[in-house]
Amino acid sequence: MGLEARHCCMFLLVFASLSVEIRADCSKDCASCALHLGQQREINSLACTLECEGKLPSAKAWGTCKELLLLTKVDNVQDGEKYQDNNDSHYAAKKYGGFMKRYGGFMKKMDELYHAEPEEDDAGGEILAKNYGGFMKKEYDSDRDAADLLRELLATSGDPESSIYHDNNSETPGEINKRYGGFMRGYRRSTDLEDETSGIQKRYGGFMRRVGRPEWWEDYQKRYGGFMTRFTDSFLPSDEDGESYSKENPDMEKRYGGFMRF
């Protein structure tokens, strides 16, 4: 019995508190309506409050107040959006200085007129293909073929020895492209040529590339004309002297060849 009485008391307290809150909200809403509408006779604060609490049948006073409250909420939402836009504009002006102040409206207008979604960007190629038929495809294929041909020429550098590398290499072209791309094809050679070149490079460096060629002397003669001819006649030994020198110094001849005659 005591437990039921306790539950009833708790229920009455909760109902009373809710009634007080509802009464306070109704009084506040009706007072706000009376303040906004001014001295209109059809709005009576007391009647509006009683109608809101349900003590009187709903009449014109509470209905007019509800409409006014809805309009007020809409205005508050719009004011909040304007305030947010103003804050964004102020932040952009603070970040970018006078640039946004000068060109911001123009950029915003252009974005509204020509704004494109990512799906529209992806569909741009399809639209071109539909409008121009196979023309765009041919241009794309020709550009791709030209790029592949140029890459192949740069990779091989026009050197016929590259075919030797392709014959001696056990890897397939697909594996080569996957591993090195087109870079290593132009610089790797056969095993014999690599050993010979590395030995000369290790021993003489870049010096032999300039003067170790048989035609290097002819190049100088063509470049300097009769001056080099007179120089060779005056200072350089003849072939007979060079042969005698080679016989006297076989080690030098073996090591440096005909280069030491000069």
Curated annotation (Swiss-Prot):
Keyword Nucleotide-binding: no
MF GO annotations: opioid peptide activity; opioid receptor binding
Post-translational modification: The N-terminal domain contains 6 conserved cysteines thought to be involved in disulfide bonding and/or processing.
Protein's UniProt keywords contain Signal: yes
Name of a matching Pfam family: Opiods_neuropep
GO cellular component term, pick one: axon terminus
Residue positions assigned to the propeptide: 110-131, 139-177, 190-201, 211-221, 229-253
Domain of life: Eukaryota
Transmembrane segments: none
A Gene Ontology BP annotation from the UniProt entry: chemical synaptic transmission
UniProt signal peptide: 1-24
Keywords: Cleavage on pair of basic residues, Disulfide bond, Endorphin, Neuropeptide, Opioid peptide, Secreted, Signal
Function (record text): Enkephalin neuropeptides compete with and mimic the effects of opiate drugs. They play a role in a number of physiologic functions, including pain perception and responses to stress.
Family: Belongs to the opioid neuropeptide precursor family.
Name under which the protein is recorded: Proenkephalin-A-A
Name of the gene encoding the protein in the UniProt record: penk-a
